[in-house]
A protein has these predicted regions:
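Enrichment for repetitive, rod-forming helical segments
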Residues: 9-10, 41, 46, 180
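N-terminal helix-rich structural modules
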Residues: 20-144
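Bacterial Sec-dependent N-terminal signal peptides
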Residues: 1-23
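Mature-region segments of soluble proteins
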Residues: 105-182, 186-192
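Low-complexity, intrinsically disordered/propeptide-like segments
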Residues: 9-13, 27-31, 181
């Protein structure tokens, strides 16, 4: 009888965990979709050049980011990075951290690095966040993932944020599964942004 009771408790516990994980997966997947759709919208509005539309889209993006951060940071602070999530849910956690302010990026970067080392998220994701943190601190980046822009009278000029070791850049990018820098720059050129 004790074995059956223990077995039933174990089954109920596993079932509850699976349902809880599905619910968390669904929540995080919805956060991923909101994060990406607001960024796609701002990208198309940005190309239109209408300042009022750009400002409105930026405000909407900030509101979505704050909403997403409240949920994700609440989860991370309460229980750490949840195990057993689908890849899209794990990606959502990364994106929310990546799009946060510098203090939050620095706080959660160790978790991002750990999950990248475990293969839960891509090593390129951790490299991107590391570069973004360095750029925001005014330091040279390592992997060449970050760009910046300067407005001039004749338009906007984009450039690759300075890199710590340009001679080894492609080698470092390869270590974290990022494409060669020439391929990365070509992507920007395809989008009409000259680096």
């Amino acid at each position: 009888m004790k074995r059956w009771t223990l077995f039933l408790l174990l089954c109920v516990s596993c079932s509850c965990f699976a349902q809880e994980n599905q619910s968390l997966d669904s929540l995080l997947c919805a956060i991923h979709d909101k994060d990406q759709s607001v960024r796609q919208r701002i990208q198309s509005v940005f190309l239109s050049g209408n300042r009022d539309s750009i400002m409105a889209a930026s405000l909407q993006m900030n509101a979505v980011d704050q909403e997403n951060q409240a949920v994700v940071f609440g989860i991370l602070d309460k229980e750490g990075w949840p195990a057993g999530l689908c890849s899209l849910a794990n990606s959502a956690i990364f994106l929310v951290i990546d799009h946060a302010a510098l203090p939050a990026q620095e706080k959660y970067y160790p978790m991002v690095k750990e999950k990248a080392d475990e293969g839960i998220i891509g090593k390129g994701d951790a490299a991107t966040l590391q570069d973004r943190i360095l750029m925001r601190k005014g330091e040279k980046q390592i992997y060449g993932t970050q760009t910046a822009s300067v407005r001039k009278d004749d338009g906007t000029v984009y450039y690759l944020w300075p890199v710590e070791n340009p001679d080894k850049l492609d080698e470092l990018r390869k270590e974290v599964n990022l494409p060669p820098i020439a391929d990365y720059i070509a992507i920007f050129k395809q989008q009409g942004m000259m680096l």
